[in-house]
Amino acid sequence: MLTSFDESYIATAFKQNVHQLYQCAEGWLGATCEYGTLHIDEEQYFLEKEWIDKERFIPVITALNRYVQPLVRYRMDDILVLKTKPCLCGSAMTAVEKISGRCEDTLYFPSKDQALRPVYADHIHQALRVVSGNVHQYQLIQYSVHRLVVKIQASNFLQAIECIEQQFEKLFFSHGLKRPLLEFVPMEALPLNQTFRRTQRLSKCT
C-alpha cells in the first residue's frame, strides 16, 4: 500500500483517483472499493484484531482453504486503523481507514516522564505533507531515541530543512515528546537491488 504522501503525489501527477491492492508475501488480503476505502477480504480470511489502542490494531489472519500454504493465526507486521463509520459501498467486510505503517518501523521517543512513546509512520507522513511541494523524497532513520537522521531530496535543500524542523517541532510537542537531534543529509539514489523503506528504526528502543 502507498503512503498518503506517495498516493497524493501519484494522484496529482496523473490527475486520477488511486485505487490500491493490499497484499504481502502470503498473497492477496484486500483492496479499495469504488469509494477508495480499503476492505479486508474476509471471504478468504478469518480476521482477528490485536488492539494496540482504541483505533489501531495488528491483523492476525487465518486461511484454512489454502492447501499449499495454510495460515493459522498469522500475525502480520502491519498496523491498521479501523474505519469508525460504515463505508458507503455497503460492504460488511472490515473497512480500514489507513495503514499506520509497520510495527518494525514505528519510531519511539521519550516523553517528559522518560517513558518511550510510539510515533507511527502515518503521523510523520501527515506532518510532512505540508512540505511535499518542495520535498520530492525523504527517508527517516532512527539510530537512537535521541538521534534521527533525515534524508531528503528537495528543490531547495535549506528551505526544506527549515520547514521540516518546524513540522517536527509541532509533531513532538503535540505528542508530549522530547525532540531528538535531527541530522539532515541529502538523499542519494537508492540501488535498484535494495527495498526502499521510508521509515527505519535501527535502535532497539522497545
For each feature predicted by the language model, list its residue ranges.
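Active-site glycine/GP-rich loop and adjacent strand/helix microenvironment
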Residues: M1-T206
